[in-house]
């Protein structure tokens, strides 16, 4: 399949070009002390506001997973809905939202996961994933990996097979990739487009 934006063939072994990475990185904004003091927040809204940047992002995500036979894309609340929904259409896969408790109207499965202080929970509608379906977990950012790991646990709870994890941004210094590898195994590749080291 040829990308109308980049003019390249989708190849799941290909890596993003340096030009594409520079372009996307230029559309990510650092916001100091948000949502609390000491946090350097990666704001994706400039990327979303630029049609070319958004096209490139979706092209690169689809390029990586087009050969993985994905049946279901799970998007994690809330920015995972943006990328996951669009990516599911490109991969001809179903889209399933994972949300915080009390946001989904029908019966749900729920998992709890650890935060730095305390715990949080995620929910998915029961019956969203058929047993044996190959599931791709999508979110905007990989930090510690707890949220994505919980979404994968929900998918497995319904009998799904985790085919991989896809992120726009990864904070390499927070260890999320290692956590996902530990819990999901090497059979579930972790792909992030833009990487940041500490202090970037």
UniProtKB/Swiss-Prot annotation:
Keyword Cytoplasm in record: yes
Main location: cytoplasm
Reactions it catalyzes: AMP + diphosphate = 5-phospho-alpha-D-ribose 1-diphosphate + adenine
Taxonomic superkingdom: Bacteria
SUPFAM superfamilies: PRTase-like
Membrane-crossing residue ranges in chain numbering: none
Biological pathway: Purine metabolism; AMP biosynthesis via salvage pathway; AMP from adenine: step 1/1
Pfam family, one: Pribosyltran
Keywords for the protein's UniProt record, in alphabetical order: Cytoplasm, Glycosyltransferase, Purine salvage, Transferase
Molecular function terms from GO: adenine binding; adenine phosphoribosyltransferase activity; AMP binding
Record EC number: 2.4.2.7
GO cellular component, one term: cytoplasm
Location(s) in or outside the cell: Cytoplasm
An annotated GO BP: adenine salvage
Cross-referenced PANTHER family: ADENINE PHOSPHORIBOSYLTRANSFERASE
Family in the record: Belongs to the purine/pyrimidine phosphoribosyltransferase family.
Its job: Catalyzes a salvage reaction resulting in the formation of AMP, that is energically less costly than de novo synthesis.
Name assigned to this protein: Adenine phosphoribosyltransferase
Source species: Sorangium cellulosum (strain So ce56) (Polyangium cellulosum (strain So ce56))
Taxonomic classification: Bacteria, Pseudomonadati, Myxococcota, Polyangia, Polyangiales
């Amino acid at each position: 399949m040829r990308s109308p934006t980049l003019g390249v063939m989708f190849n799941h072994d290909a890596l993003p070009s340096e030009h594409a990475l520079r372009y996307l990185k230029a559309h990510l904004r650092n916001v100091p002390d948000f949502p609390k003091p000491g946090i350097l927040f990666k704001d994706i809204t400039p990327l979303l506001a630029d049609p070319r940047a958004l096209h490139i992002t979706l092209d690169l995500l689809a390029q990586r997973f087009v050969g993985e036979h994905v049946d279901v894309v799970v998007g994690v609340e809330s920015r995972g809905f943006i990328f996951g929904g669009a990516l599911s259409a490109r991969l001809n896969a179903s889209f399933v939202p994972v949300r915080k408790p009390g946001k989904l109207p029908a019966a749900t499965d729920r998992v709890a996961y650890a935060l730095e202080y305390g715990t949080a929970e995620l929910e998915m509608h029961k019956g969203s994933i058929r047993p044996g379906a190959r599931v791709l977990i999508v979110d905007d950012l990989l930090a510690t990996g707890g949220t994505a790991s919980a979404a994968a646990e929900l998918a497995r709870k319904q009998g799904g097979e985790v085919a991989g994890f896809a992120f726009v941004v990864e904070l390499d210094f927070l260890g999320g990739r290692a956590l996902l590898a530990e819990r999901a195994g090497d059979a579930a590749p972790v792909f992030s487009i833009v990487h940041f080291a500490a202090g970037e």
